[in-house]
Amino acid sequence: MLIDGIGAIDASNTSDDHAVSIDALTAERIEVLRGPAVLLFGSQAIGGAVNVIDKRIPLRLPSESVHVDVLARSDTATDLREFGGSLDARLGNSGFVFHADGSWRETDDLEVAGFTVAPELRADLLADAAEEEEEGHLEEAEELREAADQRGFVPNTGTETWTANAGFAFFAGESSLGVSFGVYDSEYGIPGRPGGGHHHD
């Protein structure tokens, strides 16, 4: 994952259960790179790369003195509430451009039709429950049956994320110099495998 051609140096590089700290809502465009072009971004991109182009550091002088974008989105599967906006402003005729953007997103647990686990996994859970019951572990058997019969919502899949970014750039002819600062704060759940925590000696 890249941001403006630079690797997204975050916890997602160390573990698959960490989300990338990239907000697609306020991105200008997203590039999917494959083939020889990915070698420009180092050996870790051998399988391809995703380059998110944002506007935190303005890349060009805007044609308007002030430009504002506002976005909103919702869905019913997760009861998504999402808002975002960005501002680009030329500071007179000085060659300075200011940018600011922010977003907020919240979702509830994912709503699904039917059972929350796949048929094969549900069969395994019910078989494990029967085995636990035969061995006299009635509480564990009941927990496994509850996990197998769970339906409607996938537990621990809700999220809440907010971002805030600001940047300046100075343009002089064909040259430019810019700096930016951003905050990305996210709380998200990782659904566990039902029945994965039952072990006996």
Q: How does the language model describe each region?
A:
Residues P155-T161, E174-D201:
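Flexible loop and strand-edge segments within Gram-negative outer membrane beta-barrel domains
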Residues D16, S63, E111-V117, Y184, ...:
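Outer-membrane beta-barrel translocator domains and adjoining extracellular loop/strand segments
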Residues I6-P36, L40:
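Short acidic/polar hinge/loop motifs at secondary-structure boundaries
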